[in-house]
Amino acid sequence: MRFELEGRIIFSKDVSEETQKDIIEVLENGDIFLKGVPEGKENEASKIEGYEFEGKDLKLNMTSGTYTRAHEGIVRLKKPIMEKVGRKHQIGIRDVAIDTYVVTITATPSKVAELKGLKVPECEVELDNEKIKILFKNLGDGELKRNIIDRAIKFVKTELDKQEQDLTFEVCKIAPGTIVSDYKATREITFDKDPTELAEPYGWVKRFPGRGQWFYTAPMAKLFRAFESLIVEECIEKVGFDECLFPKLIPLDVMYKMRYLEGLPEGMYYVCPPKREPEMFRDFVNEMMIKKEIPIDKLKTLLRDPGYVLAPAQCEPFYTFFDHELVDVDSPSKFFDKSGWTYRWEGGGAKGLDRVNEFLRGECVWMGSPEFVEKVRDDTLKYAEKLAEKLDLEYWTEVGDDPFYLEGRKNEDRGIEFPDVPKYEMRLWLPHVKDERKGVAVTSANIHGTHFVEGFGIKDYKDRKVWTGCTGYGLSRWLIGFLAQYGYNYEDWPEIIQKKVGKLPEIPKLITWP
C-alpha cells in the first residue's frame, strides 16, 4: 500500500522563526517514524517530503508504505514537537488536520474490476486498472481518533478478499456481528470521560517505556483484584472450574500444533534464549560500558534462534497437558488460570488502557463431549452477563468475527468439526465515544470443535467425539468498561464493588508526578 498525505499541525499561536528552527530539528529526525518498524522495512515508514510554516500552521506533505503510515506519522510528530518547543516557546498544538489523503492499494485488474460501484462512507474510491485509490478530505483529530481511515481501508480490503475470507465467515452459521443479547443500565449514566485520559492525571497508572504497557498503582491494582475476585466467585466457580497454574513461556512447537503460526504469526512476542558463553557476553558488557549505549547488533549474535513465544492466548498449556492422551468424555476436564500476564503484539493498534500488549485475564478451558462443551460455553457467558447486570453495566453480546484459533486463516484441510457459532463476544458500552455505539470486549466465549483435539492427537478411549472450548474474562477490559460507565469517584460505585475494594489506597506521593 502507498499513503500520500497533505496535512497541517495547527498551533495555538503564530510560529516564530526561533520556534520554527526547533521544530525543523524534529522534522529532520527520521528516527521518529522508525519505532516498531521491522529491520529492512525502513523505506516503508513515514517520510516528510516537504513542509512550510504559515501563521499558526505547519503544512506537511508526507508519504509512507505500510509501516508507520502517514496518518500515524503526522500524529506521532505531536509529542516530540511539544517536548522541544512547548515549554521553551510557550506554544501548544490545537489540532491535527488532514486536508487530502490518498491511500493506494494494488491488486489484480480482475479483482479491482469487481469493486466497481463500491461506496465507502466518509471517503471516495477510485478504480484504475491495478490500483484502488481511497481518497479522504478534511479530516480532523476527531476523525483520526475514531479510526475512520483504518476502518475504510479494512472495509475495502475485506471486499477485495471476499473470495478468500477467513474461515470464520465460512464456518459461522450466524453472521458475525449479530447481537444476540443486550442490557440497558437502569440508572442514568452521566460519566462520559475517556477513562484512559483521567487515569494518569489521577495517579492510578503511569506509562511504562514499553509500547502497550502500563504501571498500575495501588488504587488500580485494588480494583483489579476486586474484579478478579468477583469474576472467580460469580462466574468461574459457579461453572465448577478447577484452578491450575499455566506456564506463560510457550515452545514454538506448541504454537505450530495450534496452527496459531498460520493465522496470526505477527501478533506474538518471540523469545530467543541466550547462548551460555560468558566470555562473549563480557565483550558485550565492555562495549556497552564504553559506548554508553546497548550494542544491539552484538547482542543479536549472542542469542539463539527464537524457541518460544510469550503466551498470546493463555489456554495453550491446556492442550499440551492432554497431548496424545486418552480421555473419557464422561469425566470431562474444566481448568482455569489467572496466574499471570498474557502478551499480544498489537503494533500500531495498541492504545489507551483497553488495547494493550500486556494484559490480565481469567482463562477457562474445558474438554468433553460436544454437548458438554456447548453447555459450558453458554454457562460461562450467562454468568458474565449476570455479573454485568448485577453491577448495572450496560452491555451487549454479539457473534464474534475473530475466534483466535481461526483468525487470519483462509482454509482448513483436515476435516475438522466446527461449532455453528465459534465465538460469542460480550462488550461493555463506552459512553465517551460519541460518534458511534462502541463497546470494549470483556468476555470472549469460544468453542473449537475438534481443532485442537486433532492438532494434539487427543482421543476418547471409546473413540467418541471430543471437543474443547475456552472463555477469557479480560480483567483489564472489565475495569475499563466499569470506569467508563461509573468514573473514578468511589462514592458513585455500586455497593458490591465498594465492599470488595474496601478503602482505596493512596497514590504514590512524588514531587514531579502525577
From Swiss-Prot:
From the broadest rank down, the organism's phylogenetic lineage runs: Archaea, Methanobacteriati, Methanobacteriota, Methanomada group, Methanococci
Cited SUPFAM superfamilies: Class II aaRS and biotin synthetases (SSF55681)
UniProt pathway? Aminoacyl-tRNA biosynthesis; selenocysteinyl-tRNA(Sec) biosynthesis; L-seryl-tRNA(Sec) from L-serine and tRNA(Sec): step 1/1
Question: Oligomeric state and partners?
Answer: Homodimer.
GO molecular function terms noted in the UniProt entry: ATP binding; serine-tRNA ligase activity; zinc ion binding
Q: Which Pfam families match?
A: tRNA_bind_4
State the name under which the record lists this protein.
Type-2 serine--tRNA ligase
**So what does this thing catalyse?**
tRNA(Ser) + L-serine + ATP = L-seryl-tRNA(Ser) + AMP + diphosphate + H(+); tRNA(Sec) + L-serine + ATP = L-seryl-tRNA(Sec) + AMP + diphosphate + H(+)
Q: What is its main location?
A: cytoplasm
Q: Quote the record's binding site residues for L-serine.
A: 313, 344, 361-363
The residues the record assigns to binding Zn(2+) are 315, 363, 470
Q: What does this protein do?
A: Catalyzes the attachment of serine to tRNA(Ser). Is also able to aminoacylate tRNA(Sec) with serine, to form the misacylated tRNA L-seryl-tRNA(Sec), which will be further converted into selenocysteinyl-tRNA(Sec).
InterPro entries in alphabetical order:
aa-tRNA-synth_II/BPL/LPL, Ser-tRNA-ligase_2_arc, SerS_tRNA-bd
Q: Where in the cell is it found?
A: Cytoplasm
Give TM segment ranges: none
Free-text cofactor note: Binds 1 Zn(2+) ion per subunit. This ion is coordinated with 2 cysteines, 1 glutamate and a water molecule that dissociates from the zinc ion to allow the coordination of the amino group of the serine substrate, which is essential for catalysis.
Keyword list (alphabetical) reads: Aminoacyl-tRNA synthetase, ATP-binding, Cytoplasm, Ligase, Metal-binding, Nucleotide-binding, Protein biosynthesis, Zinc
The UniProt comment on domains reads: Consists of two distinct domains, a catalytic core and a N-terminal extension that is presumably involved in tRNA binding.
Q: Could you say which EC number(s) this protein's record lists? A: 6.1.1.11
**One cellular-component annotation, GO:** cytoplasm
Biological process according to GO: selenocysteine biosynthetic process; seryl-tRNA aminoacylation
Can you tell me which family this protein belongs to? Belongs to the class-II aminoacyl-tRNA synthetase family. Type-2 seryl-tRNA synthetase subfamily.
Q: Which cofactor does it need?
A: Zn(2+)
User: Which sites bind ATP?
Assistant: 344-346, 355-356, 477
